[in-house]
Amino acid sequence: MAPLRVERAPGGSRLGVTRAQRPTALCLPPLLLLLLLLLGAVSASPESLNQSLPESQNQSHPTEDSLVSKGKMEDYETHVLPCWYEYKSCMDSVKDWCNWTLISRHYSDLQNCLEYNADKFGLGFPNPLAENIILEAHLIHFANCSLVQPTFSDPPEDVLLAMIIAPICLIPFLVTLVVWRSKDSDAQA
């Protein structure tokens, strides 16, 4: 770390400066630092930026493209809602909503309908309405589904003892067998 020197600023206050003539960090009281931090956070928030604009600038005027897009979204919504109602009626007949094999066809049909109609009306997929429908489906039907992983437990004591004792008993037998066979091969040589 570079050693510090203290120099006087042109206004007369003392500043810490490193040997490379770079000023050191200002030493401000913690309360003042906290106040500055809070003021910076409040003034930089998007809400405060929007409030500082005049109201005439906050309201955007609809353009021809936005009206056409809004009309497409309304048409898209009228064509997609029957898909949603069909999905809901099919899901109501399913007993286990967390079993993917039972619900995958209905879920895929809903997604295909959303995608097909988005392409038909020249909208991208996913779009805000499709996202809302999919989110609604997840909140209604899959909120209580979680990944169920099997929990492993210890085997019963008799099985556990057999699994421990069997290798312990086999080791002396195998050592005896190896020694006996090595003596036998030495005797033949």
Curated annotation (Swiss-Prot):
Keyword Cell membrane set for record: yes
GO molecular function list: adrenomedullin binding; adrenomedullin receptor activity; coreceptor activity
Annotated stretches, region: Disordered: 49-69
Parts of the chain on the Cytoplasmic side: 180-189
Keywords attached to this entry: Cell membrane, Disulfide bond, Glycoprotein, Membrane, Receptor, Signal, Transmembrane, Transmembrane helix, Transport
Extracellular topological domain residue ranges: 45-157
Matches recorded under Pfam families: RAMP (PF04901)
Main location: membrane
Glycan-carrying positions: 50, 58, 99, 144
UniProt keyword Chloroplast, yes or no: no
GO cellular component: adrenomedullin receptor complex; cell surface; cytoplasm; receptor complex
InterPro entries in alphabetical order: RAMP (IPR006985), RAMP_sf (IPR038126)
Disulfide bonds: 83-113, 98-145
Expression by tissue: Ubiquitous. Expressed predominantly in embryonic brain, lung and gut and in adult heart, lung, skeletal muscle and brain.
Single GO biological process annotation from the record: protein localization to plasma membrane
Record-marked site positions (Required for CALCRL interaction): 153
Membrane topology of this protein: Single-pass type I membrane protein
Signal peptide: 1-44
Composition-biased stretches (Polar residues): 49-61
Assigned protein family: Belongs to the RAMP family.
PANTHER family in the record: RECEPTOR ACTIVITY MODIFYING PROTEIN RAMP, RECEPTOR ACTIVITY-MODIFYING PROTEIN 2
Chain's role: Accessory protein that interacts with and modulates the function of G-protein coupled receptors including calcitonin gene-related peptide type 1 receptor (CALCRL) and calcitonin receptor (CALCR). Required for the transport of CALCRL to the plasma membrane. Together with CALCRL, form a receptor complex for adrenomedullin/ADM. Together with CALCR, act as a receptor complex for calcitonin/CT/CALC. Together with CALCR, also act as a receptor complex for amylin/IAPP.
Assembly and binders: Heterodimer of CALCRL and RAMP2; the interaction forms the receptor complex for adrenomedullin/ADM. Heterodimer of CALCR and RAMP2; interaction forms the AMYR2 receptor complex for calcitonin/CALC and amylin/IAPP.
Name this protein carries in UniProt: Receptor activity-modifying protein 2
Gene: Ramp2
